[in-house]
Amino acid sequence: MCIRDRYDIYHSYEGVNNIKVINDHAGISPVEVSEDILDLLEFSLKEYELTKGGVHVGMGSVLSIWHDYREMALGESKFPMVPSMDELESAAKHMNIQDIHLDRQAGTVFLADPEMRLDVGAVAKGYTAQRLADTLREAGVTNALLSLGGNVVTIGARGDGKPWRVGIQNPDLGAENPYIQVVDLTDMCLVTSGTYQRFYEVDGKRYHHIINPELLMPWNEYQSVTILSPDSGEADALSTAVFNMKLEDGLSLIESLDKTEALWILPDGSQIESSGFRAYTEEGR
């Protein structure tokens, strides 16, 4: 059974207690899970604290509503709609992070609120990429580039000793240049969150998949946020959290973290960089 199946919130698999099984047993009983699920959830709770709730794996009740509306809009629906605030606020009553109980000794996870749902989409891909990179390093791999759906992890430098060159997606998908910047990475990771991924429109307004935990709506202050970090899991979590923060708050958080940089693309296409970001670009060398 692959790691992705363990983190699945939509499907059950025989003999595997995944995130869906945890959700199905919310308010009923603890679920015995594999160590990697406990590790992921423990990491997620740490990132919740670090980002002051900017990334929240316990808001599945809200995210599932947006998922359903988005799927309808991207499917055969001729009249795409936006969920009402009443519907969202009702679901938001069931996203208290304190209702997630991890028991390391028993190897279990329990959601105390029967209506709470986990959704690890904001952290699972980056966390999995980091674990894969760690496994490769332990096996003796010294030069590699991994790309898991936009989560890029570099192990060492290229075989010729030069850094890996990685393009940052231009959020304007119709632009002549597909990359808005190119960075040089050695033992670093890159993750981008953007409004150009998984969105639909209603009355000319874009509704993307990054839902702000406070507003319960997509946050449209940026077109994209890119994070550079030595750890792919943290980069993934930060890309969502910083996307959901005011610029000054996100910049303050990034500047407080070691070896971590960020690039914000604003709605008008202008760019804002953290203080050390330029060192990874051609202009900074």
Give the location of each predicted region:
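Mature catalytic core of soluble alpha/beta enzymes
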Residues: R4-R285
